[in-house]
Amino acid sequence: AALEKVAIKCSVENLADKTDITLPGTLFNRALKVEQKIAEGDAVRIRLGYDRILRDEFSGYVSEIATDNDSVRIHCEDELYKFRKDLKDRVLKSVTVKTLLTSVAEEVGKYEVACDYDFTYDNFTIHAATGYDVLRKVQSETKANIYLRGKTLHVHPQYAQIGEKVIYDFAVNIEKSDLKYRDASKRKFLAVVEGTDAKGKTIRIERGTT
């Protein structure tokens, strides 16, 4: 087997889910000529599991191939890789975030847009940028969850979309714990939540005591 390591990074805080595939630089004393068989933009699907029971863990595209000492690293991104296309330079005035993203999605690849935000930019300049750059700017300013599902670009506030429930089991998926019993009257808890609403306003809520 020529595979050294696979690292999958999935987080709503990142614009795109990413995977690094590490291969040895040589195999049986021969250099692996990866660039002759794999190219940027090639589709990638990763399936992992046990006892030949596999499930899909990642699908996307090769974004970069690099050498790292004696290894070859293949960097991959999920479907949002398709937005790494150059856009026409332009300045959009009094444009809502949904109209902006609809314009970008249309130019990149005829994508639909499902967006919960309705605030307006006075001016939004696109210069020497890709569709991915625009998505990253919008995410950095709104903290939105942005992802592709089929031909629809989704843009939603954090926690607006609830995924599957996860069950944590000490015998199954908890590697380490440091739990301590405390009397209810002595437990102090302070929760601070910050977010951006659909109109672009920053909201901060504190609950609890320290």
Segments predicted by a language model, with ranges:
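Assembly/oligomerization scaffold segments
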Residues: A1-K82
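Acidic, small/polar-enriched beta strand-loop surface segments
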Residues: R136, L148-G150, P157-T210
